[in-house]
Amino acid sequence: RVRSSAASDVYKRQANNRGFDTEIGCAFEMPLSEVACVSCGQCIVACPTGALTEKDNTQQVIDAINDPEKVVVVQTAPAVRAALGEEFGMPIGTNVEGKMVAALRRLGFDKVYDTDFGADMTIMEEANEFIDRVKNGGKLPIITSCSPGWVKFCETRYPELADNISTCRSPQQMFGAVIREYYRNPEINQGKKLVSVSIMPCTAKKEEILRPESMTNGRQDVDYVLTTTEVASMIRKSGIRFENIDGESTDMPFGIGSGGGVIFGVTGGVTEAVLRRLQTGHSRVEMDRIRTSGVRGDDGLKELTFDYMGKEIRAAVVNGLGNADKLVKRIQSGEVSYDFVEVMACRRGCIMGGGQPVGAGPRTRKARAKGLYDTDVNMQIKKSNENPMVLALYEGLLKGKTHQLLHRNLGVTEN
């Protein structure tokens, strides 16, 4: 059994047999296809032999970069910048966004974008969906759909929660759909075929891009997902001296993100960003009040209340599938009641995803989280609805296409 909070109660890996005959494998020696695997990648982190790795897509990406008939663009998730530096001997939690962008350009990517932009769109849509449910008596609690490991766990354990799950796509998928729509313009693609890549801290993202509800008109919006460790391997093999290169900025028109988008990478970040979106004020006092509301911290379950339109809203933030399982049972039994629930499959959220550097403990969790929170402090834009590029997108490219590109039909079914 995997002894990590993300994969707790999944029973994917255990030690089978005894003594010299001991083998690490699926529980009860079952085939991987028959166990409740949610693709979270925590088995990689917990594997005692260090033998497990993610499915490697680096060669496919390299081949695409080397194809003159293709334009290859990449988006990078917030949590990646807080962990990539560890692969090159830098202090844990160091924000290496600038160096990462420069390295990706040297690897040959034509454009480098920031998934913070996608997170801002997710916050906008999730907040709007929540407001609509509260005002019009929709299904509550609304449960976040950003974590693909959680979504798959929900499919297998709690298909009856289908109507509670938000219809919003994840930041990766929203941004992937927007990028593909943007590059349909011949003046933008210059007659070349688009290859869309994302760099994620999460192995489950590799499966997410293949899900029918994550596609637009039956076509993948994101072609390949690379994990933090995969892109670190590409940088090393290319001979780039990561620690010595100067930082560069992401490309426009998707190069501006908010602090709310950055903290998506930490458990509680989605809830905190939504709270910022719902509040009318944006002063330091208002931001501090939200920050100290109980949404942050390393606890497996955090509960908080806030006022919206004269109504007391009850929210819960849970990380780790074992904790999520317990919370769902309490909700279904009537023991507790919430209006908004954020779930992240991995402990402390994306910063501890299965695609991040291995060997992480409490000190690493704290340092990576601090790296993102410190970045948020220095961000000029704190709220997603104050991101001028996102607002311009809604008035332009997204006009009349919001539901098609940013939402999905999350058909929760039993496997």
Locate the predicted segments by residue.
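Activation loop
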Residues: 6-7, 20, 100, 175
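Short cysteine clusters
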Residues: 8, 37-43, 47, 202, ...
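Residues immediately within or flanking Cys/His clusters that coordinate Zn2+
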Residues: 4, 34-40, 44, 140, ...
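Short functional micro-motifs and their immediate structural scaffolds
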Residues: 9-13, 45-48, 52, 207, ...
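Iron-sulfur-associated redox domains of electron-transfer enzymes in respiratory
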Residues: 54-415
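Non-heme iron-sulfur electron-transfer modules
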Residues: 9-36, 50-73, 364-370
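Single conserved hydrophobic/aromatic residue that forms the stacking wall/gate
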Residues: 1-7, 11
